[in-house]
Amino acid sequence: MARKKKKLKLPLYSSKVSAGFPSPADDFIDKTLDLNDLVIKHPQATFFVRVSGNSMINAGIKDGDILVIDKSLEPVEGKIVIANVDGEFVLKRIRKKGGKLYLYPENSDFNPIEIKEGMECEIWGVVTYVIHTIV
């Protein structure tokens, strides 16, 4: 039996965050926000995974980040996906060139993976959000 999840509503301020001098008049809450509602659009098709490695660093995805993955989304050109290629899980961007399918890293230290006939490749889901700490 599935447990009912308790919502955690946190304040969402209506004012934008200033990169300069903040206005004291912007000190009010517009509404509350539950992060689950924000990042999980399809609960039955969503999972989280922690990143290991730096092949996607130029896409803003760092070692140790947590990814929100949605299995219900179409893995189209340009999307970042989790794929199982010949038994190995990889995090890459989908690209098509000359009628061929590639999984591209976002770090020039790594090579793209060309998906060739006979290879096993299953897309497990599309990355929708990246969660990482900045401190």
Residue ranges and their predicted role:
Residues 44-46, 76-81:
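Short, hydrophobic/aromatic-rich segments at coil-to-beta transitions
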Residues 94-96, 100:
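Well-ordered alpha/beta subsegment
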